[in-house]
Amino acid sequence: IPALTRTLSAGETITLSASEELKVLDAPGHTFAHLCFLTLQDGVPQAVFTGDTLFNAGVGNCHNGGSPDALYETIAEQFHTLPDGVLVYPGHDYLANNLAFTLSLEPSNEAAKSWLVRVEGVDPGKTPVVTSIGDERTFNAFFRLDSGEIQASLDLMEASDREVFLALRAKRNHW
């Protein structure tokens, strides 16, 4: 990369001000190597910039050298553990389509229905829609691995979270 003066490593924290930091997250899965960034204010997580790893109501595909297993680990360890109030800033907006995917598997999901109405007709290029980790827990199928309705849709009752995640990722590839 021309003019590169510094590289970043997973776990590194960059001080932005006396009260603001940026934590570098290792987030493989969408690609072999991927970094995301978590902002902290006085040590409290505020927002996460997820690139193509976590989308509003979805996750990234693994077509560019990534691994569904690595993506599962990243979502489970890096994002699912964040507090509800953390805002999510993905690299792209596929919210309406991803909500439709959730509803194809979990038609009774009222949060997904409500958000789909909310974003109908919204141009994400002009009016970005921001969700939180708490929102994602209510309508992102990849955060709802224990949903009986999703498990039944995949014919995976009593499967492990990993098995449900991998089946969701495979289904989303062809949906």
Label for each model-derived stretch:
Residues 1, 49, 109-113:
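Short hydrophobic/aromatic-enriched beta-strand-loop microsegments
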Residues 4-104:
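Catalytic core of the metallo-beta-lactamase
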Residues 73-87, 94-175:
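Accessory terminal helices/loops
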